[in-house]
Amino acid sequence: MSIFQKKMFKKLSNFFIEQRPIYKEYKLPHEILYKRILIKSYDNWFYQKLKISKDINGRFEIIVLHIFIIFHCLSNNDKKNLTFKQSFLETFIDELESTYREIGISDNTFSKKMKIAAKSIYRRLDVYSQTIENIDLFNESLQRNIWPLEDQDTNKVNELNEYVYKKIKKYKNKSFDEIIESSKQGF
């Protein structure tokens, strides 16, 4: 087999193998927790069982929902938590910016896309915060954000809702250090 054939075979093999995402090395506490959430966002349960779209939009929704869980659990707004939340969100926005650049969004539309994304993030965090105490309203907000073009499927919404409430129960009233420690085996 020639060198050219070997290279082509390798490229074709890689094309058909589902690649696991390559994560950069995260060392700071907010980066470590972000990486765990990012890894969780690739869990096929969201895409196969709940039928969330397996694309950049679906992954965005899953990551934002996990950010909400973290922020809700870190409701004590002392300076340490506020700094952590800000750094955590900045990491996500930096990653989102990098993703947009990788998929080729032009410089002409880049700032507009980032403004829209930032508004979407803050709007979702706000809506989830306002509705989390009322299960019906929370389900409506999940339906509207995660499955916007589908008729309501209460099974999917209820399963995701249960997932969110379980995570909140697991991490509620813990410091971010405790959340990082208890999520070592996966968020």
Question: What is the predicted role of each segment?
Answer:
Residues S2-L65, I69-F187:
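Surface/interface-facing alpha-helical segments and adjacent flexible terminal/loop regions used
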